Amino acid sequence: MRNRIIFLLLLSFFIFRGNIQAQTQRETFSVGDHTFLLNGKPFVIKAAEVHYTRIPRPYWEHRIQMCKALGMNTLCLYVFWNIHEQHEGEFNFNGQNDIAAFCKLAQKYGMYVIVRPGPYVCAEWEMGGLPWWLLKKKDIKLRTLDPYFMKRVGIFMNEVGKQLAPLQLANGGNIIMVQVENEYGSYGTDKPYISAIRDLVKTSGFNKTALFQCDWSSNFTHNALDDLLWTVNFGTGANIDEQFKKLKELRPNTPLMCSEFWSGWFDHWGRKHETRPAKDMVQGIKDMLDRNISFSLYMTHGGTTFGWWGGANNPAYSTMCSSYDYDAPISEAGWVTPKYTLLRDLLKQYEPGYKLPEI
């Protein structure tokens, strides 16, 4: 009996010690001078943009594995408000909508996550992710400090925080960055609104991770907040140095990141499938990696916009196809493409001594 008690005491001690060590050994991510820092060491984000809503849940794990085998170290994803709150006050984060499960799957394969909760996300999605029922209030002004709009955004952000804030890196999860709004400079100029969205993101629980805002290089300064990281969006064929020129002038010590490097483009009904040359995409990524510039490849896998969730463009009304193939490295059906092979061969060169998983 005495030996058993001693054994149990020793077992409890080692379990307690192991828990303490696990807590003290948690990873860290921060924004340093000229570089991101992961566990205190320079880190280049190589992110794959994928959307959980456009991939049937049984295939989530496969697509994440494909991104890992490509050579990516991070997943980037939007949170689509209107699919989680299809009716006012009724939230659904189960099944296909279980974003926490998606992030945990990414962590299973050693991948970090960048979350982009909007509230507006664009993404060629119905109303840019904003719920239809907001328009029942006839005088509402979307993406402004409209009291009703901001009230509903706050409620939504709190629900997202319940799901994802526990998964921040500082909490033992894998979320390293969270975006505030989305390309707002192409919509308007309203720093008070952006500031309010930032505050809602923080109060929803995302107060242990880096916050950032993204925009095109031509207008990112219109709403840029001093306390947020700034990133720029551009696509295949762009002049890398020119895209970052203004940002480097304003913030010479900031880490550089292309938060959306467009691998292809979206398709409209009645038009030809959009494509972009694989060699141009790969060259653009090489140019960034040679400069230690982080990137998120939008899209790495586009998938399918199921149901009636496809959006449309204005002022010349033009609807999106249900296919969101995007001419991405991983095809709509989840297949390897020539883009995938070329990019994988490139990324191997920037991970000396690391063997990529088999495809």
Outline where the language-model segments fall.
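Substrate-binding/catalytic cleft of secreted carbohydrate-active enzymes
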Residues: 24, 115, 119-152, 160-297
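Aromatic-lined substrate-binding rim segments of carbohydrate-active enzymes
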Residues: 60-126, 198-209
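Bacterial N-terminal signal peptides
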Residues: 7-17
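Conserved residues at the C-terminal ends of beta-strands
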Residues: 49-51, 78, 181, 301
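Carbohydrate-binding surfaces of carbohydrate-active enzymes
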Residues: 153-164, 171-179, 190-194, 207, ...
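N-terminal carbohydrate-binding accessory modules
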Residues: 5, 20-74, 104, 110
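N-terminal secretory signal peptides that target proteins for export/translocation
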Residues: 1-2
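Aromatic- and acidic-residue-enriched carbohydrate-binding clefts of CAZyme catalytic domains
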Residues: 41, 78-90, 95, 123-148, ...
